[in-house]
Amino acid sequence: MNTREIGNEYEDKSVEILVKEDYKILERNYQNKFGEIDIIAEKNKEIIFIEVKYRKTNKFGYGYEAVDRRKIMKILKLANYYIQSKKYQDYKIRFDCMSYLGDELDWIKNIVWGDEVGF
């Protein structure tokens, strides 16, 4: 399997988990002029922007470590554009990372708090 196929596999696993926990999947691999986010979901009037990361081993770090300041700034711009264009201004906003080390999931909720960055 190439890296794209592996990425899709773990995004699929993440979607399965989200659906089991009653999240509604709004978008997958959403792109706009600011970048791309793996999953956008909704639950209880909250929009969740989710980055999925996979590492076979932690030799080069954990997946969530790839969600650095630069990536976060792109996600924030992308999210703001999405919220405005889709009319979700009355929703709370959350940013998560679903990070896999092998098949072990570390779901980090609120990697950035929306109200801390002006949402």
Curated annotation (Swiss-Prot):
CDD domains referenced in this protein's UniProt entry, alphabetically: PoNe_Nuclease
Disulfide bridge map: none
SUPFAM superfamilies, A to Z: Restriction endonuclease-like (SSF52980)
A molecular-function term among this protein's GO annotations: nucleic acid binding
Transmembrane spans: none
Pfam (any one): UPF0102
UniProt cross-references to Gene3D superfamilies, sorted A to Z: 3.40.1350.10
Family designation: Belongs to the UPF0102 family.
UniProt name for this protein: UPF0102 protein FN1370
Organism annotation: Fusobacterium nucleatum subsp. nucleatum (strain ATCC 25586 / DSM 15643 / BCRC 10681 / CIP 101130 / JCM 8532 / KCTC 2640 / LMG 13131 / VPI 4355)
